[in-house]
Design a protein with these regions (language model features):
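Terminal, low-structured helical/coil segments at or just beyond the last alpha-helical repeat
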Residues: 125-179
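Canonical tetratricopeptide repeat
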Residues: 27, 61, 95-96, 139
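TPR/TPR-like (Sel1-like) alpha-helical repeat modules
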Residues: 76, 80-86, 101, 111-134, ...
Length: 179
């Protein structure tokens, strides 16, 4: 982390001489992110987005910074924007699934399985957008034993095609459909 801390002053100096240099700003935003200085990282990535609103990477790295700060709802917004600006870029959708997967831990048994199902569905969406995204395939397989089983649905009286709202993680605000 010390090399990241040592990079801040020189980068800020360079930016003071060339305030719209996207390369310097990107490095500075990433350095602040590595140092867990979310406020500064957010400021830099917001500035980058204003300078280059059509650059998918700025939204993506902003999303990663927010994710690492635990601001999952805001991170999802940036990941979705990155995918949109990137004309269906799959990697940010993979990260959206990762946000859901990371959030499942605070839920009880069945609710946790439903959140994992949402994560798995989101990974499937990313994989359908880019069949070379092997990380998505890996996560789909890793979660295969963590999603609701036929017995889970049966004992809860949930029918195939029934919508199941996710309520244990407030920021998600989505539902999944029982297979």
């Amino acid at each position: 982390a010390s090399e990241w801390a040592q990079s801040i002053a020189p980068l800020e100096f360079l930016i003071s001489k060339d305030p719209e240099n996207v390369g310097y700003l990107t490095q500075l935003g990433n350095a602040y992110n590595k140092l867990n200085n979310t406020t500064k990282s957010e400021e830099v990535f917001s500035r980058l987005i204003k300078l280059e609103p059509d650059n998918k990477d700025h939204y993506f790295y902003f999303g990663k910074a927010l994710m690492e700060a635990g601001k999952y709802s805001q991170a999802r917004t940036q990941f979705l924007k990155a995918s949109d600006v990137g004309n269906g870029w799959a990697l940010p959708i993979f990260y959206e699934g990762f946000l859901y997967e990371q959030s499942a831990g605070g839920c009880t048994d069945f609710d946790r399985k439903v959140v994992y199902l949402l994560a798995q569905n989101t990974y499937r969406k990313a994989l359908s957008m880019d069949s070379n995204l092997s990380e998505a395939r890996d996560r789909i397989n890793a979660l295969s034993g963590a999603v609701p089983t036929k017995e889970d649905y049966f004992f809860r009286g949930i029918k195939s095609g029934q919508s199941m709202p996710i309520t244990c993680v407030g920021w998600i605000g989505k539902s999944v459909t029982a297979p």
